[in-house]
Amino acid sequence: MTATDFIVAIELGSSKITGIAGKKLPDGSIQVLAMASENASDCIRKGVIYNLDKTTLSLTSIIKKLESILKVSIGKVYIGMGGQSLRTIRNTEVRHLEEETKISQELIDTIKDSTRGVPIVGYQILGVAPQEYKVGNDLVTEPVGVQTDHIEGRFLNIIARKNLKENIYQCCEYVPIEVAEDADDLISPLVLADAVLTNSEKRSGCVLVDFGADTTTVSIYKNNILRHLAVIPLGGNNITKDICSQQIEEEDAEALKQQFGQAYIEPKEDDDENKVYSLGGKCSINAILLEDIIEARVNEILDNVLNQISLSGYENKLLAGAILTGGGINLKNMEVAFTKRTKIEKVRMAKETQITLKGIEIKKDGSTNTLIALLAAGKEDCSLVKPEPTKPEPVKKLSSATVIEGQLFTTDGRSPAEVEEEEELKRKMEKEAIFAEQKAKKEALEAEKKRKAECEELIQEAVQLKNEEKYGEAMKKLKRASAMNIPEKEEAINAIEQEVKELKEKNSITGKLAKFFTTILDED
């Protein structure tokens, strides 16, 4: 049975890369159609690709597994960006207007675009979260329609090292598979928050902590706005490695952690110092030693979480408390440990999202929440070619086949394996051709987007030069902007050009003399 109009999402986790295909239903739920995963320990570190070849192989394998279940080729995917180096920084953009002007959405968009253009060495701005706008002496979140001659936009820029995004796109190009156009800046912690947090929690103020294998991500919300985001390079794997330091194999260390580990243990006076935890004679460790190792590392992670909450400046404003998610929350007593260490009393364990799922059974332990969130964020149909509806394909027969050594050969001497190989090659070439066409379209759109950004930059430079009374230079910038032939910018260019001409005339010697004589005549 084939599936059409489905969405495919892939999560690049530190322990495994997982792909999922699902279909959005009219009632708002998602029907999960297929799921596949590959080990990521040798290609993903701290949530970031470090071995491109192995990541490409894993992605290729996952795509093939999903296609095998769906019976349809996959043309594009949604991949979230997360991991170490992802964080937020504050930025402010100011605009001085010539006179009292009603703020338009176009002006707000221009200010927001300007903050995206702020250069940060070695980093790339993946997203911008507006905080508030200072209009006059007032702070507002929705300034459109307000009259003012001065506006100050305060933003939170979401940044990451340039290779974070570049490596994802490079691996997808090698597969080859296209990244969906509207997934260009799909940031995993943001879509996770949309899927896990309630509107009330975002509004009242909360911290979302995602305990992963190699990283712990902290996201803080207040008044429905992202206020702080940071990725701590510590996770569940650090606990496992600490246990390994006791001459224990990694697989056994993970088993000991899951079977006997606790994030918090109430102190006891009569602790048995000789108590031992054992995996059926395979390996063993002193119970108190294991408890101390786990508790020490958990406390280190929680101290870093608390530090990020403090750095945000919102530690006393989180009325909805903390929401914990991710595979790490399955460590026993994690909720108690979090409360004891951070002093945050209100804690919710989010082992599943707010999204209703149907179809294939999905783990409800917090480990798949980001994957489900990425699937829910998808909008485009990810199938490569839609098959003919309901029309069954005729059964193919080998004509004039001859039996030779147990195999069927066609009259031209090809074996079934060779026929299948040729068909597979043909399908691959068709897929690559479609991918190349889609890539060309995307590059054209990106080029157009870049042209518009350059035009907007020229306009802003012209406005600045106009304000500095450098009218000749301002006109040169406007002529360059006009020569780019961008229809939606023509009106703005003409308006500024007219304003420059009027100001130039007004401030010329002739203009000043005319104004002088007019003043004298008015006085007479």
What are these regions (language model features)?
Residues 9-10, 19, 79, 172, ...:
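Residue-level signature of catalytic and energy-coupling elements of molecular machines
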Residues 318-341:
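Glycine-rich phosphate-binding loops at beta-strand->alpha-helix junctions
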Residues 63-75, 302, 306-320:
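Phosphate/pyrophosphate-binding loops at sites that engage ATP/ADP/AMP, CoA/4′-phosphopantetheine
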